[in-house]
Amino acid sequence: MPKHGKKYTEMSKKIDKQARYDFNEALELSLASSYVKFDETVDIAVRLGVDPRHADQMVRGTVALPNGLGKEVKVLVFAKGEKEKEALDAGADFIADEETVAKIKDGWFGFDKAIATPDMMGTVGKLGRVLGPRGLMPNAKTGTVTFDVAKAVEELKAGKIDFRVEKAGIIHVPVGKVSFGPEKLVENVKAFINMIIALKPASSKGTYLKTITVSTTMGPGVKIDPMFTK
């Protein structure tokens, strides 16, 4: 177990670890536990009653957070011709030309998300070994392999996130910044939870939402009662 500092320990004492809070209470407690000087990211971790080893219990999707993430999202687009222009007009930061592709092969990752038109997947596929492990591989299921590059760029810039359940049945995503305040964070959290509920696999038996925990980058976790999602 990692050893936490004095301030973390002090803040942890203010949170009842056995309690389960509603959305507003949980976010207010989490924000009150922030003790660092930088604008921390607020994260949410949801443990689901699924076994992702089975394909029919995989939970994966995207959601547009109503208030974004509070940070600039750098977007790289694999496109050519008119689609390249559309991507740039929509706000894309980089176009993957030959020089950029070579930089990626050499270890450059100055972008947060990647989009590709279907006709460029031959080029993208050659970068699979470097993009895949970093979660940067364009994927049709998350809307990042598409000819509608303008829409894809705009959505990512606005705070659209993609997620998938991990081996332990947990989905972990950022939902904003401490500076957002409780109201905007609650809106983002609810949008994410509602999407998780909508994606419940038919084969999932028993309790689906097992635990929901919210925390700041450096702060302790605060549990949300799943009953408040109904």
From Swiss-Prot:
One of its GO terms (cellular component) is large ribosomal subunit. It holds the Pfam family Ribosomal_L1. One of its GO terms (biological process) is translation. GO terms for molecular function: rRNA binding; structural constituent of ribosome; tRNA binding. Keywords: Repressor, Ribonucleoprotein, Ribosomal protein, RNA-binding, rRNA-binding, Translation regulation, tRNA-binding. InterPro entries: Ribosom_uL1_bac-type (IPR005878), Ribosomal_uL1 (IPR002143), Ribosomal_uL1-like (IPR023674), Ribosomal_uL1/biogenesis (IPR028364), Ribosomal_uL1_3-a/b-sand (IPR016095), Ribosomal_uL1_CS (IPR023673). Coiled coil: none annotated. It comes from the Bacteria. Belongs to the universal ribosomal protein uL1 family. HAMAP family: Ribosomal_uL1_B (MF_01318_B). PANTHER family: 54S RIBOSOMAL PROTEIN L1, MITOCHONDRIAL, LARGE RIBOSOMAL SUBUNIT PROTEIN UL1M. Part of the 50S ribosomal subunit. Binds directly to 23S rRNA. The L1 stalk is quite mobile in the ribosome, and is involved in E site tRNA release. This is Large ribosomal subunit protein uL1.
